[in-house]
Amino acid sequence: MQKRSAAGVAEPHRTHARHGLVRSPRPNLGFERYDECFIARWPFPVRRVDGMGEALKIGITGLPGAGKTYCLLKVIEMLEADGLKVGGMITEPIVKRNRREGFYVMDWATKEKRVFASREIQSKTMVGRFSIDISALEEVGVNALRSATANADVIVIDEVGKMEVESPNFVQSVKDALDADKPLLLTLHKKSRNPLLQDIRRRDDVRILEVTMVNRNLLPYKIVKLMKGEVL
C-alpha cells in the first residue's frame, strides 16, 4: 500500500534499479541505507572525469582499526588500474614490538614520506602520547594535497584526524580540495569534534560512509561503483 503525505498525496515507492527491490519512503534524515553502510544523499550536479561518473566527494569514517586506510588503499588500487591519476597524502603507522610508536605522512604521487608523529621527536604540539612535527606534515602532506588539487584526477586524504588538524595549512588545504571540482576520497576521525571535521560532516556535497569489520572488504567496490556512477 502506498503511503500518503500530510497533504493526502500518495508517495511512490522507490525501486532499486539493479536488484528490482522496492523501497518504501522513509523520513528525510539525509542518509540512505546501502547494504551495511549509510550514505548521505548527493543532490547537486558536478563535473565528470573521464572513466568516472559524477565527481563525488566521499568521506570514509569508522572506529580505530575498522579499516579506513585499508578501504581507501583498495579504492586507489582499482582507480589506478583504470588509468586514473591519484594524488594526495596517506598516513602510515610506525609499529615496533606490536606497539604503535608514531606515524609517517606520505605523498602518494611521489612516495616521499617523513615521520610527523612520534613518541621520540621533540615538539611543542602534543596529541595524546605523540609529539607532532608540523613542518614534516606540511612539507610532505600539505604540498601533496596542493599538487593533487592542481594536477590529479582524484584527490585522496588520509586522514583528517586529531593530529593533522593541528596544522592551519593542512586545514586550508583540505578546504581547498573539498572546493575543487574533482573527485575526492578522505578518511575521517569518527568522534572528533574539531570544527573542520564538523564542517565536512555537515556539507551537502560529501557522502559519508562508515567502514566496519563486516563491510570492509565489500565497501571499496561499492565506492568505485559510486564514483563511476554505476550505483546511486
Model-based region annotation:
Residues 60:
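Hydrophobic anchor at the beta1->P-loop junction of P-loop NTPases
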Residues 64:
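The conserved Walker
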Residues 68:
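Conserved lysine of the Walker
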Residues 71:
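Hydrophobic positions on the alpha1 helix immediately C-terminal to the Walker A/P-loop
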Residues 77-127:
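N-terminal phosphate/diphosphate-binding loop that engages ATP/GTP or pyrophosphate donors
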Residues 124-169, 175:
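Phosphate-binding/switch loop-helix module in NTP-utilizing enzymes
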